């Protein structure tokens, strides 16, 4: 339990509430604090480490300033929010909830259950909430969250440590010594004593301070530590106050008779050595804690000479250390670009680590010879949106878990020891693990999945665009249309022609660095980055006509940066809704194309992307029954497909599962959709908007 240089050098003391002017002129300042000496001088014993809910070996703190994580709002424990690491000291993190100000910063241990990696909330089916006191309109929260996470550095799951187990019994005894967090100044850890024990609670009293700072807590509280904890973790332990008489073993200066039996552990006029790592903050315990001040770093060894103490010197603010925090200039950089980029003082400009991505699963596609179709059906419809490393790991792990022969699929993964996500598999009686390459962009993750799917011979299994819930099969769409009417099935087979009024959703390029190139291609015909696709005529089977235009944006490795056009608007709706208009990506397909030979015309463009036309509600109803409240479940689903193809895929199954017909559609509210249907806030708000628009155009 050796003393660290940083801790010894930081002579940061608390102001003595009972200090008199006479004692301040001759008391001795102590530059360090040793538990062994203190226990011997006071005749006390320290509480055994088994009494605490703390790790026997303190956890390693490898977090960096600026990292993002999920944390529970300390003022609303039911909400999980996005937080940023603002400061680091010992095994603790100073956190700030994104969307709040610096008045509500809080501290957590690296093994606290209140913090978790970004993506955990989504994985468990929960929603990230705005913090209490969110400074903007709550309707802006989804967009704020997206901007905050995009390009930010996410704390790796390996940085989070498991919470230690709870001691079975309360074995604390009155008089035992320990280290405890001052709850009125939570950045301080001070020597304390067990003042009382009642059931599973203990009374914490701070040595040398009045009872104003004492508090009761559970015996398994994470705010109390065994003696010596700060030295082991590199945190700063504040020395006791002045009420405890201590026999000094160091040279004493002359003292007045009034203080012969009492020695102050702090005196501002004594010589103090401040090493280069010292940082300055407030530490008066007389005043209530205010906002955390910005720490300042000293660049040279300073020698503070004795000086006469004035009448108001008792109110002088003392320095308070915060290890591994940031300078004022760095803190300013933490908040630029709406908090999207951060700098670490130790490592310089931070690297943009990752963005977000969402990948959809085609459960009616070709699974190849290596994946079990039954297990594929049990997968979620999509992975994400979330950090690219998390989404990539979950998808690859799902493919390994769905393998007919785990060893074969696992063998397609090439080991990479650069610190990426870990994939595990069990075969040959052993558990094997392999690291994926580290990812820092959505395009890299999508290209990796393209190659992986190509190796598994299931090129159309994954897509960056949603699939149709019942018409994504590349071989026979009729097999998955048992719940559709015969008329709809026949109409779908005639949809190889696209009318000028047919809506084509905007397809996001696989790589965000690609030029804005809009091109048409068939499902099996990739478009290369150079723009040189091979125009050709394809003979499509009768069963594959509908699937060719309803396929998703497959992740095909045949090209470097492939793009595919995904459509989900049927020909019958285009004819029945004359008021529906859209702006196509480029050009139009030749009207002379036969149903069996479709020539795809391509043209490079750099103008603004196209938009999805949202039909007027009054026009939409003409394609169905007169009154939307009489719509069937299938008509509601068809309405959503035409209104917003981007969210219609996941909604189709939900609407069928919950039997959402026209009447139920009008009764849907955002909170109901989020709570009972599991929708995220963004899709729920979109759906509410469409419902309101539909109500406005409702027939009287």
Curated annotation (Swiss-Prot):
Family: Belongs to the SCM family.
Predominant localisation class: nucleus
Domain of life: Eukaryota
GO cellular component, one term: nucleus
Gene designation per UniProt: SCML2
MBT-type repeats, residues: 33-131, 139-240
Domain spans labelled SAM: 631-700
Protein name: Sex comb on midleg-like protein 2
Biased amino acid composition, Polar residues: 19-28, 253-281, 575-584
Cross-link (Glycyl lysine isopeptide (Lys-Gly) (interchain with G-Cter in SUMO2)): 518, 536, 599, 605
Lineage, highest ranks first: Eukaryota, Metazoa, Chordata, Craniata, Vertebrata
Region named Disordered: 1-33, 253-320, 466-550, 575-594
Species of origin: Homo sapiens
UniProt xrefs under InterPro entries: Mbt, PcG_chromatin_remod_factors, SAM, SAM/pointed_sf, SAM_Scm-like, SCML2_RBR, SLED, SLED_sf
């Amino acid at each position: 339990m050796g003393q660290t240089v940083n801790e010894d050098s930081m002579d940061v003391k608390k102001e003595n509430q009972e200090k008199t002017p006479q004692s301040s002129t001759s008391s001795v300042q102590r530059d360090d604090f040793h538990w062994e000496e203190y226990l011997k001088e006071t005749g006390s014993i320290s509480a055994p480490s088994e009494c605490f809910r703390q790790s026997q070996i303190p956890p390693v703190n490898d977090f960096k300033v600026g990292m993002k994580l999920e944390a529970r709002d300390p003022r609303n424990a039911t909400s999980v929010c996005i937080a940023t690491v603002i400061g680091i000291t010992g095994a603790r993190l100073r956190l700030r909830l994104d969307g709040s100000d610096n008045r509500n910063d809080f501290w957590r241990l690296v093994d606290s259950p209140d913090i978790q990696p970004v993506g955990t909330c989504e994985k468990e089916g929960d929603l990230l909430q705005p913090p209490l006191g969110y400074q903007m309109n709550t309707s802006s929260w989804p967009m704020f969250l997206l901007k905050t996470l995009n390009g930010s550095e996410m704390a790796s799951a390996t940085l989070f440590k498991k919470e230690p187990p709870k001691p079975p019994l309360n074995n604390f005894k009155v008089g035992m010594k320990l280290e405890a967090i001052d709850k009125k100044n939570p950045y301080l850890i001070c020597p304390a004593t067990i003042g009382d024990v009642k059931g599973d609670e203990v009374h914490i009293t701070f040595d040398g301070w009045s009872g104003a700072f004492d508090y009761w807590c559970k015996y398994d509280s994470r705010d109390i530590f065994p003696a010596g904890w700060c030295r082991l973790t590199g945190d700063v332990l504040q020395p006791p106050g002045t009420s405890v008489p201590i026999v000094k073993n160091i040279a004493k200066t002359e003292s007045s008779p009034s203080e012969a039996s009492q020695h102050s552990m702090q005196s501002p006029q004594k010589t103090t050595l401040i090493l280069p790592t010292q940082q300055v903050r407030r530490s008066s315990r007389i005043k209530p804690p205010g906002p955390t001040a910005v720490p300042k770093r000293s660049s040279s060894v300073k020698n503070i000479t004795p000086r006469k103490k004035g009448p108001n010197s008792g109110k002088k603010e003392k320095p308070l250390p915060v290890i591994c925090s940031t300078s004022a200039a760095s803190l300013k950089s933490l908040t630029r670009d709406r908090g999207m980029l951060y700098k670490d003082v130790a490592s310089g400009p931070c690297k943009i680590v990752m963005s977000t991505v969402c990948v959809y699963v085609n459960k009616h596609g070709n699974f190849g010879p290596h994946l079990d179709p039954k297990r594929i059906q049990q997968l979620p419809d999509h992975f994400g949106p979330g950090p690219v490393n998390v989404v990539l790991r979950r998808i690859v792990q799902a493919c390994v878990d769905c393998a007919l022969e785990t060893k074969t699929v696992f063998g397609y993964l090439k080991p990479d020891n650069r610190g990426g996500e870990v994939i595990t598999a069990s075969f040959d009686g052993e558990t094997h693990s392999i690291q994926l390459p580290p990812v820092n962009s959505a395009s890299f993750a999508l290209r990796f999945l393209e190659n992986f799917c190509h190796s598994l011979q299931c090129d159309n299994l994954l897509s960056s665009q949603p699939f149709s819930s019942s018409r994504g099969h590349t071989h026979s769409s009729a097999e998955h249309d048992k719940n559709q009417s015969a008329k709809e099935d026949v109409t779908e087979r005639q949809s190889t022609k696209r009318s000028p009024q047919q809506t084509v959703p905007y397809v996001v390029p696989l790589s965000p660095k690609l030029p804005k190139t809009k091109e048409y291609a068939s499902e099996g015909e990739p478009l290369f980055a150079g723009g040189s696709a091979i125009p050709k005529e394809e003979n499509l089977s009768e069963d594959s006509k509908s699937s060719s235009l309803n396929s998703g944006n497959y992740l095909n490795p045949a090209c470097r940066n492939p793009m595919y056009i995904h459509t989900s608007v049927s020909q019958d709706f285009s004819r029945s809704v004359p008021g529906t208009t859209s702006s196509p990506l480029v050009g139009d397909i030749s009207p002379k194309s036969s149903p069996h030979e479709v020539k795809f015309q391509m043209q490079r463009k750099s103008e603004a992307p196209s938009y999805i036309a949202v039909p007027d509600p009054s026009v939409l109803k003409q394609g169905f029954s007169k009154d939307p409240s009489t719509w069937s479940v299938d008509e509601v689903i068809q309405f959503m497909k035409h209104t917003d193809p981007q969210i219609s895929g996941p909604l189709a199954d939900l609407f069928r599962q919950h039997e959402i017909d026209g009447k139920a559609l009008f009764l849907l509210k955002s909170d109901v959709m989020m709570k009972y249907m599991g929708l995220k806030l963004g899709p729920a708000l979109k759906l509410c908007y469409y419902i309101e628009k539909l109500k406005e155009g409702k027939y009287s």
